[in-house]
Amino acid sequence: MKSNEGKSMTTPEWAKHSPYDRYFDFIAPNADRYAILTKQISAIKFNSTVINVEGNNHIFVFPAGQKSLRSARGVFPFSGSDPYLFSAHYDRVAGSPGANDNSIAVFHLLSAALALAQKGIDRWLIVFTDKEELTAGESFEKQGSFTLAKKIKSWGLEKAKIFNFDACGTGKVFIISTTTDLILKTSGQNSLRPNIRKVIKNIASLRDHALETAQKLRLERVLLAPTPFSDDVGFLRAGLAAQTVTMLPANEANQYEALLRDRPDFGNLIISGEVKAPAEYRRLPETWRSLNNAQDTPSRLTPEYFNTFVNFVVGLCTGK
């Protein structure tokens, strides 16, 4: 096995097939993740456009039949309509392989794009966002999704149904995040945007659709619960609704659900940052404690559930 480099001599079966065949290159220590990702998008023959917003390179992927921004003379695909917009950040914290956060969700979405193409479904966009990970002291206004959301609105995509995927490679339990609910409840009126009622309504609609999709697919388990911050917070701060979805192993989901019953305030600790205190941090699911550090390795992934995720994304597009 190659130590700390690209592909292993014993590459797992799932990583031998497109689009996952560049996954191990993507998580290598010195990987040029932007270059690898854009080349892989080209290799699987999807249209794409890279849009730089305040120094962050966001990669948009379109169905093969849709023109990219450049070839459409500046008109963004689906402008004025309500496509599904699936987001996943492709940056990672320095020193972490980023196997689950968030490399696997990136490749899952490419796999979902191929599945959607096979079914002839083309009312979707994917955006791989830059700068989801913030450094100490940075506000959410520095998050890539915050400045991107402002552009999305100016492109006529304010009606897009945004689903954000983060850390979706470990376990089979889908966690439908309620973090934005807590932020809205704890925010002072001065920080709320004028269209906040519309945003709240849209978040509820996205969540209902996620739950309906899970029911339609007969997923074994779904949990509504607060989760660590993701791009949904940046979207929210800019006045766009987005629903984050993540995944956990069943035993961790059970323990977390029990914790939330005993400690209804625990979600507020995530919002305030107090969860970082050692006494509280150890209560987080183990999967989440492994993120943003050297423990976020491929050994923690559960490939037997990868298709479940892809089917969920496809299911979102085949609903209402």
Residue ranges and their predicted role:
Residues 12-77:
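A non-catalytic alpha/beta surface segment that caps or lines the substrate-entry region
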Residues 27-35, 99-103, 107, 139-143, ...:
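Soluble non-cytosolic domains of exported or imported proteins
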Residues 82, 86-94:
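Glycine/charged-rich beta-loop-alpha catalytic/anionic-binding loops adjacent to active sites
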